[in-house]
Amino acid sequence: MSKYIIIDSREKPKAIGKILDHFDKNGIEYEVSKLLFGDYMDWNRPGIVVDRKQNIAELAKNCTVEHERFRREMEKAQKAGATLVVLVEQNRYKDRDSWIEVNSIEDLLRWSSPHTMVRGEKVYRVLASWTAKYPLRVEFCDKRQTGRRIAEILYSGDPGLK
């Protein structure tokens, strides 16, 4: 089965240049079209959709200010029988004088935004609730590995994904 990814038309070309480079270098075909939810989906395997987040701050915004909009997106995924994998392009953050590695939502507990009053504990509670209620998975990666991770998620043999 060939690899053919649909990229949501609302993804900004400048933001995804390195992702497209990865797809091109690895023979992954793609086209840009509007998706009902998420940002990346394999044409042949629509049960998994990746929703890319630029950083933890964007994820936090989805959990707070944009809570209702993002909840509706998860409901669309659930109704379609799809798993929504949120891929955050940040896998560490600075906490005072040290770097904290982020491998799971639990690692967000100590996070805080220098620009807003949002605390990691709040983000964690919202995500824990959502992952229990919706077909949602949250992953973190280094920004340089986003294209590779999207392909791995969409083409993995992970039984936890449809």
Residue spans for each PLM region:
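Non-catalytic C-terminal interaction segments of nucleic acid-processing enzymes
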Residues: M1-P46, A57-K162
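Conserved catalytic cores of phosphodiester-cleaving nucleases, focusing on short active-site segments
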Residues: I48-Q54
